[in-house]
Amino acid sequence: MKIIDLSQTLYDHMPVYPGDADVIIEQAQTFAKDGWNMKRIHINLYDGTHVNIPIHGTKNGRNLDSYIIDDFIGKSFLFMSEKDIKKGYGVIFSDKNIDWDLAKIIVKRKPKFIGLSEKFEFDIEIEKFLLEKEIISYERLANTQKLPKEFMFYGVPLNIKEADGSPVRAFAVF
């Protein structure tokens, strides 16, 4: 069994989407003063590796509470061609961004979820189109060039009430 970490490292003042608030990781308590160490983080739900769910880009989409953990885990394929987009399976895009033609194929074939390498960002209109069609998507996946053709993908969100997305610790097992 091999595991590949697909998550970006979160760190203080890391790059964020233009216009978003800065990531801040600060020392809230120290061992010397308080008897333990504790850091506090200030992040947007879309900083680093994260999952997008419909309410993020639609007026009446589903929020995180309406999903179960199984929705974020599944057998997946590394995208090489349109054949790799299959109903009920995940598909990860490492070497190609999603254009309108691919977005329409994705909606038609209904994969369990899709994911984009950190090399790419969704076109906002394409992202909204996919969210309107209830396609779960991951962004800023790291190390996608190390993925085999088939693998189990895990990208489980934090359990945040009524959330519109979440940071994830994503990884592949094969």
Give each language-model segment a name.
Residues M1-F174:
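Active-/binding-site microenvironments in catalytic and ligand-binding cores
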